[in-house]
Regions:
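Loop-helix junctions at membrane interfaces
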Residues: 1-174
Length: 174
């Protein structure tokens, strides 16, 4: 009995280790895509709208889960900020979108809810969370809802691309 149990535990450990390594590799590639595509942003007020971030948030939400999505969004935002291609406002927008989109997909397994979760998480929650950062840390004058429209526009652009890309990836069982 002990031998069978130990064999089971070893197989389970190897399988979990393989899954973790795969997820880390995918997250690394998504972070690299986010950093390399950073010049593809457009300024709206104090923010730099970056639809590619929302595309990779949705890919991470669907294929990696909310935990990896949030960590990936944080690292991408940090690297974009360090290279001068992002702002502090990227943190709440990308991380809230990845979290809400990831949780929506994790509990429903429905792609449309991942898309809506990303839009809501970034466009509403992330935009409202960006307000104190803009006002108190960046010293910008802004109304409470000033970032909602730019964040929704940015998120919608990435979501439209993600609809086609994630659907294709799901159909090919990637």
């Amino acid at each position: 009995y002990a031998i069978i149990l130990e064999e089971f535990n070893q197989r389970r450990f190897l399988q979990m280790n393989k899954i973790t390594t795969r997820k880390l590799a995918i997250a690394g590639v998504l972070i690299a895509v986010g950093v390399v595509c950073s010049p593809l942003n457009f300024p709206v007020g104090a923010s730099k709208c970056f639809p590619v971030q929302h595309l990779i948030n949705i890919i991470a939400s669907v294929f990696l889960g909310p935990f990896y999505g949030v960590i990936m969004a944080f690292i991408t935002s940090l690297l974009r900020l360090a290279t001068g291609m992002g702002t502090l406002l990227a943190f709440p927008g990308s991380m809230c979108g990845a979290l809400i989109g990831g949780l929506c997909y994790k509990f429903s397994k429905k792609l449309p809810l991942a898309y809506i979760g990303e839009l809501f998480g970034t466009g509403i929650i992330g935009a409202l969370a960006a307000y104190p950062i803009a006002v108190y840390i960046m010293g910008k004058e802004a109304a409470l809802f000033a970032y909602v429209l730019p964040f929704i526009i940015s998120s919608a652009g990435g979501t439209v691309i993600a609809i086609f890309l994630v659907t294709a990836l799901k159909q090919t069982h990637a």
